[in-house]
Amino acid sequence: MKLSQVVVSAVAFTGLVSAANSSNSSSSKNAAQPIAGLNNGKVAGAAGVALAGALAFLI
């Protein structure tokens, strides 16, 4: 059961990253580089939350 929860969280995380990357790639043409950096920071923060959730399931 724990393994399936980790797999589900990993799939949700990859879906989140792919959605963020697609939105960034389409809007980065008109966006300034600092704004793109902030978006990357938000993606990294979401990655940390997803990893913390996966570790919480393992413990």
Curated annotation (Swiss-Prot):
Query: What keywords appear on the UniProt entry?
Result: Signal, Stress response
What induces or represses this gene? By osmotic stress.
Q: Has the keyword Acetylation been applied to this entry? A: no
Q: Does the keyword Secreted apply?
A: no
**Domain of life from the UniProt record:** Eukaryota
Q: Which GO terms describe its biological process?
A: plasma membrane organization
* One of the record's GO cellular component terms: endoplasmic reticulum
Signal peptide feature range:
1-19
Q: Where are the annotated coiled coils located?
A: none
Miscellaneous comment as given in the Swiss-Prot or TrEMBL entry: Present with 6140 molecules/cell in log phase SD medium.
Q: Which family does it belong to?
A: To yeast DDR2.
Q: What is this protein called?
A: Protein HOR7
What is the scientific name of the source organism?
A: Saccharomyces cerevisiae (strain ATCC 204508 / S288c) (Baker's yeast)
